[in-house]
């Protein structure tokens, strides 16, 4: 998270400490999202500026919903509460095959990144289902290639969107 509380919550959730239940995990991530919305997103939007962030509600739906088997509908209600209804106008989903993502992660992995391959596949499938269900908000960009190529594709996508 981009807040002090968010950093603490994420360290607790993704570190070596006690493993939360699936529902507790979703609630803790929602607390992080609520704090981030209140401290970062809402004030930035109120100031008339854009917000660019690396995670959004799609992560909750993909990881806790599709990955953990929690109700996507219930999670969306939780997201709506946590974000006070403030959702992104554009979500860029970088399409990277799981084996390539695994190589890019290298040796340092958090608890979620260390899950079994089946979990990763469910999460990936979940992201694509979300993108397919809301094509006005989600754009899929090829994430294969070096960082400059991928960044150029993301920028081109943004330019075409705005």
Enumerate the predicted regions with their spans.
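ATP-dependent small-molecule kinase phosphotransfer cores
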Residues: 1-83, 153
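Residues at helix-coil transition
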Residues: 14-15, 46, 93, 106, ...
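Short beta->alpha linker loops
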Residues: 32, 56, 96, 145-146
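A generic structural signal for alpha->beta connector loops
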Residues: 48-49, 88, 135-138
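Hydrophobic/aromatic beta-strand patches that form the interior of the parallel beta-sheet core
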Residues: 52, 90-92, 139-141
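A glycine- and Lys/Arg-enriched "phosphate-lid" helix/loop adjacent to the NTP-binding pocket
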Residues: 59-126
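NTP-dependent small-molecule kinase module
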Residues: 99-162
């Amino acid at each position: 998270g981009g807040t002090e509380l968010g950093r603490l919550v994420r360290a607790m959730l993704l570190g070596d400490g006690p493993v939360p239940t699936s529902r507790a995990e979703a609630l803790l991530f929602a607390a992080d999202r609520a704090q981030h919305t209140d401290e970062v997103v809402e004030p930035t939007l109120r100031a008339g500026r854009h917000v660019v962030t690396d995670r959004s509600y799609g992560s909750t739906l993909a990881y806790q919903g599709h990955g953990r088997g929690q109700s996507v509908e219930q999670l969306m209600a939780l997201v709506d509460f946590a974000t006070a209804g403030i959702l992104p106008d554009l979500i860029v989903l970088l399409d990277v095959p799981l084996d390539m993502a695994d190589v890019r992660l290298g040796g340092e992995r958090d608890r979620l990144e260390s899950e079994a391959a089946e979990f990763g596949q469910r999460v990936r499938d979940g992201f694509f289902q979300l993108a397919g269900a809301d094509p006005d908000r989600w754009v899929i960009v090829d994430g294969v290639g070096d960082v400059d190529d991928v960044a150029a594709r993301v920028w081109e996508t943004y330019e075409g969107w705005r």
